[in-house]
Amino acid sequence: MSLYENKKVVAIGGGHGLGRMLAALKVFGSNATGIVTTTDNGGSTGRIRHCQGGIAWGDTRNCINQLITEPSISSMMFEYRFKGAGELNGHNLGNLMLTALDNLSVRPLDAINLIRNMLKVDVNILPMSEHPSDLAALAMDGKWVTGETSVDEMTQDLRRLDLAPEVPATKEAVTAIQDADCVILGPGSFLTSVMPPLLLPELGKAIARNQTAKVIFVENLSPEYGPAGRMSLEQKLEWCERACQGRKIDVVLGHHPHPELEQRWNFVTRDLASANRDWRHDRQKLRQAIEEQLMN
């Protein structure tokens, strides 16, 4: 039995980072699962949430886009973005399709699975929660800031991060973590992509209780801006471990060494950058690095 058939891998995050990771893990097929952040309130996603309510679909759509292997009319439609004047300008048709299917389905996960089947995507895609929630940050001056876009623009550092309102985790996401041989955090925007799923107590507890899984934190290749950009790697790792009830991160996978932190964490340094875009992870290099950890 091959590694791809024998090991179950869960990646947690959002945005382009999670999509990139899932594309690297595509060889695992249905043994790979992405748990996607659903708190975005900007762009096409934010406009849809403002009008229709519901969870944010943009990160889920992005992940599915990066997993499409067979170009088709359906995939072209799913990736289409409207241009020009009027209310449709800037909207992504995939976001609208997911919203429509959500309205027609019993639960948001049904909408995702319908799209996955239509586009022949084997990797499991799970929303962190099927209930709408926003990111909320407590600034150093004691004021709360609500919404991903507002958190990204904060000039003050953060005391804490929360979800408003508190929502339950998707039960399939909890099960996927319980059954995983490897749980991957990142890459991606730390505060707005990696942290939101970890703010759900059920997901943090599931990671803490799965003592046989290898928990891997994947560093970004380029610096972040806003409050996340002012956080040290040490702070980010501590935030993740705190959200996971003190569960130790087993491996920090990155492009550069961090000798000052090697007493506390196990660092694995690899060339992970794409040859033509050094700010973006190379799918093949990511896959090889994760496989290496699964075999150790």
Curated annotation (Swiss-Prot):
Provide a GO CC annotation, any one. cytoplasm
Its predominant location is: cytoplasm
Q: Where in the cell is it found?
A: Cytoplasm
Quote the InterPro entries the UniProt record gives: CofD, CofD-like_dom_sf, Gluconeogen_factor
| SUPFAM superfamilies for this protein | CofD-like
Which UniProt keywords are listed? Cytoplasm
Question: Which stretches are annotated as coiled coil?
Answer: none
GO annotation, biological process: regulation of cell shape
Family (UniProt): Belongs to the gluconeogenesis factor family.
Q: What does this protein do?
A: Required for morphogenesis under gluconeogenic growth conditions.
Return the NCBIfam families for the record. CofD_related
Q: Which protein, by its recorded name, is this?
A: Putative gluconeogenesis factor
